[in-house]
Design a protein with these regions (language model features):
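Short, conserved, GDST-rich strand-edge loop motifs in beta-rich repeat architectures
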Residues: 52-57, 221-241, 327-364, 415
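Surface loop/turn motifs at the tips and blade-to-blade linkers of beta-strand repeat domains
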Residues: 86-91, 130-133, 153-158, 196-203, ...
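Beta-strand-rich domains and repeat architectures in extracellular enzymes and scaffolds
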Residues: 23-33, 42-73, 78-116, 387-394
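Residue-level detector of Asp-centered blade-edge/turn motifs that repeat once per structural unit
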Residues: 101-104, 167-171, 213-216, 273-275, ...
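Asp-box/WD-like beta-propeller blade repeats and closely related beta-sheet repeat scaffolds
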Residues: 143-163, 168-173, 177-237, 241-244
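Beta-propeller domains
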Residues: 11, 65-73, 77, 102-145, ...
């Protein structure tokens, strides 16, 4: 009996092994898929774009792709690509924002190496006007054309990254929104800038981005995220998180206040000509938003334009119209990921470079600059579909018979004679 029982148990074990072997033999594809899913979920070598980070994508408010693209006027002549030209190639590095002083000098611009520089004409060239910290040094911070690559990102917290610039035309002071050092100011002679706002409600301002100055002296500025700094801005877009804020600094009391919160990558900001409202861009949600400062709608927020791509800064011309810099364009595949966070979570965990994942979604970034009236009606659209002049755009300034175009990613400025003369 013992022998039979033992023999039966051995036979049973043999059948179990046979069953397992049979599954592996007859279902290799399923096994590979299962192992691949486990590998992707664990991402042991941090090969995916999120690189082993905690990643919590969420749905966010973005207008339907088809609705936006059907109503958006296109520049089929790609006039920006035709008429634009590159300026100061490899002499400026990531010139995000462009500003001109009360004497008409400029442009002034903030660079990826942490400096604010100004153009002094061909005889002098570019000179350093300001830095945002006394810790800045040429040895630690100056990397030339490499400043706009991720080689510089690990140095940004030390060197600073000046983004939005605005002159107070009455005092000649230049106000700076720096991604790491918050809101700062420097006098007409330049030098090391003085911090004004680094915290709000006792917590650090993690990603100051752009600003504008109200006639009463208040400074409105954007704080893009409470979770991610500029070096990690990529994750703000991927997750669709909305912890950004619109802030106001009050010079008499030296205090900073939260005006609006729960924003998805608040970016550029511009007061209206009569200063009854301000416009700001939400990059993640691809839209231009109005915040009322005066009148019956004071304190209310409304979307004035849904955009075909990802907006950066917004600037006003002398007529009170608004130029918006847009990195174009959205794709239907992006909408699928936005509406289905679980798919997005899997997609960006794939051990594939981000460049290839973006290409698979049909993304081909190029520049669109658009002029709006105060109600959000599109007045003009200029495109550079082949990226001849600019692939990633940050700001448009209409000054001295030109459109001056900045970029956070390239080592040049672009310009276009304006108004355009049609041949």
């Amino acid at each position: 009996m013992y022998f039979k029982k033992k023999h039966f148990q051995m036979e049973k074990k043999g059948q179990q092994h046979s069953t397992h072997d049979s599954f592996l033999t007859h279902h290799p594809v399923l096994c590979i898929i299962a192992l691949s899913v486990v590998f992707i979920a664990i991402d042991p070598f941090h090969m995916s774009p999120i690189g082993g980070r905690e990643f919590k994508p969420m749905k966010h408010e973005v207008a339907p792709y088809k609705q936006v693209m059907e109503n958006w006027p296109r520049d089929n002549l790609s006039q920006l690509g035709q008429h634009g030209k590159l300026e100061f190639v490899d002499r400026v590095f990531g010139p995000e924002s462009l500003e001109f002083d009360g004497l008409g000098r400029g442009p002034y611009t903030g660079l990826a190496d942490g400096r604010v520089v100004r153009w002094m004409g061909e005889a002098v060239g570019w000179e350093t006007f300001s830095v945002v910290t006394s810790k800045w040094s040429e040895e630690a911070c100056a990397r030339g054309v490499d400043s706009t690559t991720n080689k510089q990102w690990k140095h940004e917290k030390l060197c600073g990254r000046p983004l939005g610039l605005r002159f107070d035309k009455e005092t000649g002071n230049l106000y700076i929104a720096d991604a790491y050092y918050g809101l700062l100011v420097v006098g007409p002679e330049g030098g090391v800038a003085t911090p004004l706002a680094t915290h709000v409600e006792g917590k650090p301002i993690l990603f100051a981005n752009d600003l504008d100055i109200h006639r009463n002296g208040s400074i409105f500025f954007t704080d893009t995220s409470k979770r991610y700094d500029r070096a990690n801005h990529f994750f703000i877009l991927l997750e669709g998180e909305s912890t950004g804020r619109l802030l106001r600094y009050d010079p008499p009391t030296k205090t900073t206040h939260i005006v609006q919160e729960g924003l998805a990558f608040p970016n550029g900001i511009q007061l209206s000509k009569d200063q009854s409202f301000l416009l700001f861009t939400e990059t993640t949600n691809c839209r231009l938003v109005k915040y009322w400062l005066e009148g019956a709608k004071t304190g209310e927020v409304e979307v004035v334009a849904d955009l075909p791509g990802f907006p950066d800064n917004v600037r006003m011309n002398k007529k009170g119209e608004f130029w918006v810099a847009i990195d174009c364009c959205r794709t239907p595949a992006q909408e699928v990921l936005t509406d289905n966070p679980w798919i997005k979570s899997i997609y960006f965990r794939l051990p594939i470079p981000m460049k290839l994942l973006a290409k698979a979604m049909g993304m081909k970034m190029y520049t669109v600059i658009s002029r709006f009236d105060e109600d959000g009606e599109v007045l003009e659209v200029l495109e550079d579909r082949q990226g001849k002049v600019m692939k990633l755009v940050s700001e448009v300034r209409e000054v001295q018979g030109k459109l001056w175009i900045g970029t956070v990613a390239h080592n040049h400025i672009a310009s276009v004679p304006y108004p355009l003369t049609m041949n």
